[in-house]
Design a protein with these regions (language model features):
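Phosphate-coordination/substrate-recognition cap region in phosphate-metabolizing enzymes
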Residues: 4-6, 10-33, 69-164, 169-171, ...
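Beta-strand elements within well-structured catalytic alpha/beta cores of enzymes
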Residues: 35-39, 86, 112, 206-220, ...
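Short catalytic helix/loop segments, enriched in acidic residues and glycine
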Residues: 54-72
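GST-like fold's C-terminal all-alpha helical module
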Residues: 182-214
Length: 249
């Protein structure tokens, strides 16, 4: 545990076989600790009002900014020094990363942004309050959409007021642009970037910070820790929470 109380920081440790062996040159070599920290963004305006944000570019609340600053100070307190950082292209994650890096005096490190670290796309649920969605769908169906690993929400259509396809950040995605995602689809969208951009940096000995979103981090934890599909529903990452240090498989 890196901290307790309001920060509710969850520490998750994993044994690294593949990465440790490659770093040391053999499968039987002793494993070196390889660090990566997963940081969920601070509270957003739609977290506070309990609306489905998905890919809508919602900013942080004052509380969220404070959570991000506290996360950075906590990282500094525990001696985390990063070589690079990664974040989604959504401002709640971007601002959280900026703030945490500033608070830990690491604002100068290289940062990479990618849509693949965006929050799960909630499709037609996007923008609805949890209360309105429950009234429309019923409590049981809404729970399936939210927590069922392979259950896709109804897709977002072009007449949706928050239609993702109109955003220039995503114009070149073509068929890769999601209209709504199950947790499984979110998992499958995140992993290519994980293996192409993050894992090679860790293999190269770099210390990495990733600022992302609740469902993205849940999917990564599932992948790293082998969490069963049905058990993933019980994992929740608080806003402003760091998961780390991780030694990665």
């Amino acid at each position: 545990m890196l901290a307790s109380g309001p920060q509710r920081v969850r520490a998750l440790s994993y044994l690294s076989k593949e990465l440790g062996a490659k770093a040391k040159g053999g499968a039987d070599a002793p494993l070196e600790p390889l660090r990566i920290v997963l940081l969920r963004h601070g509270e957003s305006e739609w977290n506070a009002s309990k609306r489905f944000s998905g890919w809508v570019d919602i900013d942080l609340t004052d509380k969220g900014r404070l959570e991000a600053a506290r996360a950075g100070k906590l990282l500094k307190l525990h001696g985390y020094e990063f070589d690079e950082a990664h974040a989604s292209v959504l401002k709640r994650a971007v601002r959280t990363l900026w703030t945490a890096l500033h608070s830990s005096n690491q604002h100068w490190i290289p940062v990479k942004h990618t849509w693949r670290l965006n929050e799960r796309h909630y499709g037609a649920l996007t923008g609805l309050s949890k209360t309105d969605a429950e009234e429309q769908l019923g409590k049981e169906m809404l729970l399936k959409y939210r927590r069922g690993y392979a259950v896709e929400p109804l897709p977002m259509t072009e007449d949706h007021p928050m239609w993702t396809g109109a955003d220039r950040r995503y114009r070149d995605l073509g068929p890769l642009l999601p209209m709504g995602e199950s947790l499984r689809q979110c998992h499958d969208r995140v992993l290519p970037y994980w293996y192409e951009s993050i894992v090679p940096s860790v293999r190269g000995g770099k210390q990495v910070l990733v600022a992302a979103h609740n469902n993205v981090i849940r999917c990564l934890c599932k992948h790293l820790d082998g969490i069963a599909d049905d058990d993933l529903r019980h994992l929740e990452i608080p806003t402003g929470c760091e998961c780390g240090p991780l030694s990665l498989d």
